Swiss-Prot record:
PROSITE patterns: DAC (PS51794)
GO molecular function, one term: DNA binding
Keyword Disulfide bond belongs to the record: no
Species annotation: Cutibacterium acnes (strain DSM 16379 / KPA171202)
InterPro entries with a match to the protein in the record: DisA, DisA_sf, DNA_integrity_DisA_N_sf, DNA_integrity_scan_DisA_link, DNA_integrity_scan_DisA_N, DNA_integrity_scanning_protein, RuvA_2-like
Gene (UniProt): disA
Function of the protein: Participates in a DNA-damage check-point. DisA forms globular foci that rapidly scan along the chromosomes searching for lesions. Also has diadenylate cyclase activity, catalyzing the condensation of 2 ATP molecules into cyclic di-AMP (c-di-AMP). c-di-AMP likely acts as a signaling molecule that may couple DNA integrity with a cellular process.
SUPFAM superfamilies linked: RuvA domain 2-like, YojJ-like
GO biological process, one term: DNA repair
Name this polypeptide is given: DNA integrity scanning protein DisA
């Protein structure tokens, strides 16, 4: 879809065909498999420009574009795909395009003259190529959802921080954050799809998406680093399995806990669990991941880190006294913030 995004020569040419109301059929690739379904027409080798695409599509028949989408290789071609291939399309052009793409595996674009609609056929599926304003409306809707999911995720992560400092984390709390990470990831993937489909029109969406991913994108990795079991046993704690869950299952915390392998089988939802401290150290310092790993290897979990003295921290290679103070102050401010909210 990125190839047909606004701003690309192919898309500009297609827009001109739509505006000219002539219609067209364009095969986005050339090769032996395409030669086998062509009859008539004439071979060419001209640079693909919006003007050339528009002019050459005025003739009867279709166009063949090179596989790198840089050149037009044939025009006025009559295509004869295998007529026994199943298609639900009704218009002649659309039926031909559907069968062509099924038979060759090459994407085929159709502009319908009567409806001014562009469709992309690929592997037996038809995708509507929407106008930028239609895409933008949907992208903005997805951004609004992403913003609200981000808010919930940040809340869950802050709640987890409080519980980590108090040493009150249960399996269900980690599962709740993992659930939110995956919900955010799904909508983010949708937004990224719109960005690539929007091409040059997608810059603003991209900027907003970048802003909404700040501080959230690494959460999944930090959560994994914090709660992975020590054993190197296969099938340890991992968020990737959540991508396979249906939305319905994703809303079920027990399912989530089982899928990330913190599950009720070996740990009931209310069983206690301790963080190593990766997330907290990453949030409050600019230490390299190597140094953070050294600190964590030294203290084994966040609880021992919380009770460590500045000098004990400073002695670890790569930390030093200034950073050690930063870490102490960071931990204390979380602790004090928690005390304050606790007393209110």
């Amino acid at each position: 879809m990125a190839l047909l995004a606004p701003g690309t020569p192919i898309r500009e040419g297609l827009d001109r065909i739509v505006n000219g109301r002539t219609g067209g059929l364009i095969v986005l690739g050339d090769g032996p498999e395409i030669n086998g379904v062509c009859s008539g027409g004439f071979p060419l080798d001209v640079r693909l420009t919006p003007q050339a695409l528009r002019e050459l599509s005025k003739m009867d028949g279709g166009l063949v574009v090179s596989s790198d989408h840089e050149r037009i290789k044939a025009a006025a071609v009559h295509f004869v795909p295998d007529g026994s291939l199943p298609t639900l399309e009704t218009g002649t052009r659309h039926r031909t395009a559907d069968r062509l793409s099924q038979q060759t595996g090459v994407p085929v674009v159709v502009v319908s003259a009567s409806m001014s609609v562009m469709s992309l056929f690929l592997n037996g599926r038809r995708y509507l190529i929407e106008r930028p304003e239609q895409l933008l409306a949907r992208a903005n809707q997805a951004l609004a959802t992403l913003a609200s999911y981000r808010g919930r995720l940040v809340d869950e992560a802050e709640n987890l921080t409080t519980l980590e400092i108090r040493d009150q984390v249960q399996v269900r709390d980690v599962a709740a954050v993992a659930q939110r990470v995956e919900m955010w990831r799904r909508i983010d993937a949708e937004v990224r799809g719109y960005v690539s489909a929007l091409g040059v029109e997608g810059r603003l969406v991209q900027l907003q998406r970048n802003e909404l991913s700040l501080g959230v994108e690494d959460l999944g990795r930090l959560l994994t680093d914090d709660y992975r079991p020590n054993s190197v046993a296969p099938g340890g704690f991992s968020l990737s399995g959540l991508q396979k869950l249906s939305w319905e299952d994703l809303l079920n915390v027990t399912m989530v806990a089982e899928t990330i392998n913190l599950g009720p089988a070996e740990h009931p939802l209310d069983s206690p669990i301790r963080a190593r401290g990766h997330r907290q150290l990453t949030l409050m310092t600019d230490l390299s991941s190597r140094t953070i790993q050294r600190i964590i290897d030294h203290f084994s979990d966040l609880q021992s880190l919380v009770s460590a003295s500045t000098s004990e921290l400073g002695d670890i290679k790569g930390v030093g006294l200034r950073r050690a103070r930063e870490i102490r102050q960071g931990l204390e401010s979380i602790f004090e913030g928690d005390q304050r909210t606790h007393h209110h």
